[in-house]
């Protein structure tokens, strides 16, 4: 994983779209690592912004004997994100999915109240929810590349592997 952003950081929107684009069954991670190479049971990305900067991480469920290969592939994918950012197709799909999920969540009064309350608590303001869709829509391919370069640094990552105990 990598150091991430805070809730107030404007980079949050581009980084959330990178996370979304790397996390579903049509994502570059899933297609390459699981489907093409057969190295994983599941894979994706997590982006956890917080009051203080959080983290961005890739995760994979794999067999113990495939850990090194998976790690190499994840590093290659991070390098591709730094080099090119998301493709237009990936970015558009991520925007549609993320904005759609947020619109559905806003239909539930409890979820809406919780989001507005948390936005106020985090110092974003209760009206933040009304501006989010526009902020996601404004993210460009160049911005996804810029945030990947800024946050997915090869020399500033932490690798954590959890597996069975060795006898």
Question: What do these predicted regions represent?
Answer:
Residues 9-22, 31:
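Active/ligand-binding-proximal structured segments within catalytic/core domains
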């Amino acid at each position: 994983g990598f150091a991430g952003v805070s809730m107030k950081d404007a980079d949050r929107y581009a980084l959330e779209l990178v996370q979304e684009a790397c996390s579903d069954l049509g994502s570059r991670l899933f297609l390459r690592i699981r489907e093409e190479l057969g190295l994983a049971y599941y894979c994706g990305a997590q982006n956890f912004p917080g009051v203080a900067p959080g983290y961005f991480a890739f995760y994979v469920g794999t067999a113990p004997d495939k850990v090194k290969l998976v790690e190499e592939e994840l590093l290659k994918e991070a390098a591709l994100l730094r080099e090119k950012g998301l493709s237009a197709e990936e970015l558009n799909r991520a925007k549609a999915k993320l904005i759609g999920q947020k619109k559905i969540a806003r239909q539930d009064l409890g979820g809406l109240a919780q989001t507005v309350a948390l936005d106020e608590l985090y110092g974003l303001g209760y009206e933040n929810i009304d501006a989010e869709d526009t902020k996601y829509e404004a993210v460009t391919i160049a911005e996804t590349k810029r945030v990947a370069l800024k946050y997915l640094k090869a020399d500033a990552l932490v690798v954590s592997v959890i597996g069975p105990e060795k006898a």
